Amino acid sequence: MIIRSGVSILVDHPRLYWNDGCGPEIEWIRFTPKKIAKDKMWTAKEDSRYISPVVGLPGYRHTVGIARSSHFLTIPFFIINGIVFIFLLLYTNLWKRLVPDSFQIIPDSWNVFLHYATFNMPIEPNGFYHFNALQQLSYFAVVFIMAPLAMLTGLARSPAIDSRFNWYPKLFFNHQSARSFHFLIMFAYVIFIIVHVALVALTGFTKT
């Protein structure tokens, strides 16, 4: 729900920038074929794209208000879920399975990635069912890096935070770069979910 509403917010202005100028054709990426004429008046409203409600929440076009409300409504559940998850990790000592204890995990993760990328299946009986270096590094990044950054960059987009603490968005350079970072984190989450579900399906739901 939080990702789908985020997609609806994104397509209302499907361009991402690294500065607050947001001038014509200075975006670093766009999700629309439409180009902006530099010699005529233009508003972001004209740039809004339609998206299927199957993908976006609520989907359609010019629904950014509902999308933002849906996005904000899911945030408390995202935070509570994260707090409970981390508490259980600490309480059960399972955090030791997620937190790397050596930089050796980086070359080890690369080796595992090459193993996956060449479609080589792990040797049984352990196979996929015990954490390898890439899994450990991925889960650590999702829980302890991506989740906090998603919340921090999201706060940098808040007008209330900006008016009260106008120094805060500058931690991410500016408002638009915070939006870009927020999108990149969402994209990383989507990739993680797709790969995670694909590997679970590949190895068998009952075994994993």
Regions flagged by a language model, labelled:
Residues 1-208:
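Membrane-embedded alpha-helical bundles that constitute the cytochrome b-like, heme-associated redox core
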